Amino acid sequence: MSRLWLTGYRSYELGVFGSQDPKLLVIKDTLKKLLIGKLENGMDWLITGGQLGVEQWAAEVGLALKPDYPELKIAMMTPFAEFGSNWNENNRGTYAQLASRVDFHQSVSEQPYHGPQQLRNYQEFMLTHTDEAVMVYDLEVEGKPKYDYEAITRFAEQHAYPLTLIDMDWLQESANEYQENSNNGSQFE
């Protein structure tokens, strides 16, 4: 069994607004290619959070891959109970719909948010229940994922825990490839 933690930027940090944003199509295509490679090398659990952005997109991509990779299991873990309750109705609905479709959905803490220790406990849980991490994160473009990056690198100093960073250069290369394939009439989902 191989378990992958996938996390990264929130949608607003990447300037992605709406499901038809060209940036989102490139990000999802990048995640799809990466996940297929991981699946073909033995990954069977995709474990992500519920944040708006990379985490929800990863769950969506994983769900789209399940027909071709029925062995894939997807877990959506959140740091605390009532996660996302302060979001607008549309975002809450998207989150609830995703949570109902994944194989496993649970909060690390059964309490509503009451402090940053819950977030640290979440990071510790994710690190000790996965075998590697992938982050859509660039060291030169800080954002909320900085805290997960720091936790992962500290953990990796003491444990064999690989981290793959999908940085802005990787995303730009993916965008160029996506555009080239679109111009050549290749089909992307």
Curated annotation (Swiss-Prot):
Organism: Levilactobacillus brevis (strain ATCC 367 / BCRC 12310 / CIP 105137 / JCM 1170 / LMG 11437 / NCIMB 947 / NCTC 947) (Lactobacillus brevis)
Coiled coil regions, renumbered to chain: none
Assigned protein family: Belongs to the UPF0398 family.
Pfam families linked to this entry: YpsA (PF06908)
InterPro entries, sorted: YspA (IPR010697)
Record protein name field: UPF0398 protein LVIS_0849
